[in-house]
Every structure is written in C-alpha cells, then in structure tokens.
A protein has these predicted regions:
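Non-catalytic interaction-recognition regions
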Residues: 1-421
Length: 421
C-alpha cells in the first residue's frame, strides 16, 4: 500500500488495503512467504503542498484572513493537522517568515501526523504491515541512483535524462527520469524501489505484487520495462489495478465528508457501517469493476446481505454443535442424505479454491464461494435432523467441517466469525 501521507485515508485506500491484506493471507495459506509493505510517499512536491497548507491553516488560528496558497490542500483535514500542530507548539510559529527551514518543520510534522493516523486507521481496519519504507529515506541513503546508473536504455535530451520505454512498442512515449533541473521524477524512485524490493527478497523465484488504482494504469508498462532493463524477469513483478468506488446512500452519491469537506474518510465510513461490511463488499467485487458502495445494503441484517448470511450460517453451525455436545465428532457412516452430499461437494471445492486464488490473485472468488457454502448449509440445516439421528456423529462431523471452512474463509478476509447471532 502507498497512500500519500498528506491527509486521512478514504474508501479508495480501503479497497487497496482490503484486497492486499486478503491476498497476503491467501498466499500464506497456500504456503508462500509474504512480506507486507507500506511505501511512504514522502518525497516530492505533494509534501511541500501539505506543509504550505498546514502553515496557512496554523496562521489562520491567529488571523482568520491569512490567505491559503492557491496550489494547496483546501480540505478540512489540513485544519485538523494545523490544530494538532498548535496543540504542541502554541504560538511559537505565529507570524514567522515562511523560510525553507520553517517549511521543513511543518512538512516533517505533517508527514508524521498523517502516517500516525494512517497506521491507526489501518490497524482498526485489520491491516498491519511488516515494513514501512520511506521514499525520502531511499534518497537520503543513496539507494536510488545505483539502480538508475545501471539502466541500459537511457539517453539525454533537452538537458533531461530519458528512459527509452517505447522500445518494444509497449509505451506510447519515452519517459523522463531526471528533469533538466536535476530533480528526479516519481518514476525514477519507482525504478529503484522495485529493484530494491526484489533484492531484499533474496529469492530467485521471489515476486513483487503491487496494487494500484486504475488511474495509474499508464505507469504499468514503463515500470515493467525498467524492471526488465535492469536485468530482472518480467514475471517477477505483478501489478493489479482496481477501479474507482462511489459511496451511495438512499439512492444518492455521498461525495463529501461532513466533517472535513473532502472525500468521505475511511474512519467516518467505518463508524457508520463497520469494518466487516466494508471489507466484505470491497473484496466481493472484481478489481476491474467500478463499484457503488451502498451504505443501506451493506448494513442490512437480512437475507439480502451476503455477509449476514455467511455469518449467520457460521453461528448456526456453532449453536448446533453445542447442542450435539460431541467435541470431536468423527464421520464413520455414509451420508446418503442429498443435502449432506451437496454440502460435502461444496466443502471439497475449498482447497482448490485457495490454490486458484493464490495463482490468479482473484480474491473476489472467496466471498461467492462462502455464500454458496452457507446456502448449502442452511438447506442441510432445514432439511436434516442431526440431534438424535442414527448417524448423529457423522452429521455433526459435517457440521463441524462446515464451521471450520466458514471461519477460515472469514479469517482470510479478516472478518469476524460470530458464534452467536
């Protein structure tokens, strides 16, 4: 994940996180070693824009007429950032000249405050990371230029350094990696970052999986080209693109945060509908599909809500096993009941599903499978007597197997599996 540390997380970031975290869980279940990483984009002009915005909002605490820079972040999140800065520094920087040194102070504060909130929101959302990599630190520790100097297909033009990404016909134009004024581009850092990650894996079969918003689709081929240009295999980097999301409520699009006047934040949405509902809905859709997140539908506690059906089936299985009272039931009898056979058939699909998702990265296959399994279990439950039946233990073993798979599938999505509802 790599949301800029310039504000609060929104629903688009949540889709990235939900897909990525679930994919990591599935890959680990399939036997892979997985490293979860957050790339902190703290090098570049967006950080200066944030610093300028916080400084202006801070000055407005003392002088409401203090102007906002035209090219700045005007959302209410910068007001909250400025208030947090004031809570620490009071009037220490009131009316100071806005020099480069002062900008660095506001920039550093903004980055740390944003990252702190991002980590908190992700943790509440059930997403944690093994590594945080700072882009600014990559430059400070000279980890960018060695890779850039090893590129084979660069050339100079108009004072800038270009990478010949049109070679092979997969990009529509060559790309600047170092501007004529000596500043590096975002692409420059991306080139070095991906090589560094592969080297850190220290595995000839290691693979990097990036998850990007579809608005970055134009970057895919140039990143893969640079990866190959450095001598790495193209199949060692996979870039998944996810489409945009609209938030809907009462049939209308919810565009704005009531508190901040910007995009609806993940924190606000989670408070309204809960993390489980967000995660399920975002994972249930193909990456390639634009989705409408309907707040009314995801909060329904009835048969119209797939997540509710799955959770209810798990709770039902737990309750039935409690009534049977056999701790480790063993299937010793042939199950000739058609509903039991259907349930067995569904359960047999689970290992193959895990293998398929680990190979294709299609985590959206998991929710419909769990829904199908839940419906098969509900039919079994409604049409089969378990308690006191002649083959009670075998039927109870089937119920327990269903409970285990439902719980495991929900766990892969970091969604609660309730024992009572």
């Amino acid at each position: 994940m790599s949301a800029n540390p310039t504000g609060y997380l929104h629903i688009g970031h949540a889709r990235n996180a939900a897909i990525g975290a679930t994919l990591c869980n599935i890959l680990e279940k399939a036997g892979h070693r997985v490293v979860r990483e957050y790339l902190v984009n703290d090098y570049g002009n967006q950080m200066n824009k944030m610093a300028d915005s916080i400084f202006a909002r801070y000055q407005q605490i003392f002088n409401p007429e203090f102007p906002m820079p035209e090219d700045s972040y005007h959302g209410g999140d910068m007001i909250e950032f400025a208030q947090a800065f004031y809570n620490i520094h009071k009037d220490e920087y009131k009316n100071v000249e806005y020099t480069d040194e002062i900008r660095k102070i506001f920039r550093s504060f903004g980055r740390d405050f944003a990252l702190k909130n991002i980590i908190e929101d992700m943790k509440k959302f059930g997403v944690t990371f093994d590594i945080f990599t700072s882009e600014a630190e990559q430059y400070a520790k000279n980890r960018v230029w060695p890779a850039i100097h090893r590129l084979k297909t660069t050339y100079k033009k108009d004072g800038a350094t270009w990478l010949e990404t049109t070679k092979g016909g997969k990009d529509d134009k060559d790309r600047v990696i170092i501007k004529s004024n000596g500043d590096s581009t975002y692409f420059c850092a991306d080139i070095a970052y991906h090589e560094q990650k592969l080297l850190e894996l220290n595995d000839p079969n290691g693979k990097i999986v990036d998850i990007w918003g579809a608005d970055h689709s134009g970057y895919v081929e140039r990143v893969k080209f640079s990866f190959e240009d450095l001598g790495h295999r193209r199949d060692q980097i996979e870039i998944l693109l996810f489409q945009l999301i609209r938030i809907m409520k009462n049939g209308k699009e919810v565009k704005m945060s009531k508190r901040l006047g910007t995009s609806l934040t993940l924190r606000e949405l989670a408070e309204e509908v809960g993390n489980d509902a967000i995660r399920y809905f975002l994972i249930d859709r193909s990456y390639n599909s634009r989705i409408d997140f309907d707040i009314n539908k995801v909060t329904d506690n009835n048969e119209n809500n797939p997540m509710y059906i799955i959770k209810y089936a798990h709770a039902r299985a737990c309750q039935l096993l409690d009534k049977v009272g056999i701790e480790n039931p063993i299937a010793s009898d042939e199950l000739d009941n058609e509903y039991a056979q259907k349930l067995v058939a569904e359960l047999k699909e689970y290992p193959e599903l895990i293998s398929t998702m680990a190979k294709t990265y299609k985590v959206n296959l998991l929710p419909p499978y769990l829904l199908k399994l839940s419906k098969a279990f509900n039919s079994f439950y409604s049409n089969t007597k378990v308690l006191g039946s002649p083959n009670e233990q075998s039927l109870a073993a089937l119920v327990k197997a269903t409970k285990i798979v439902l719980a495991d599938g929900l766990k892969l999505m970091d969604i609660e599996a309730p024992e009572k509802m």
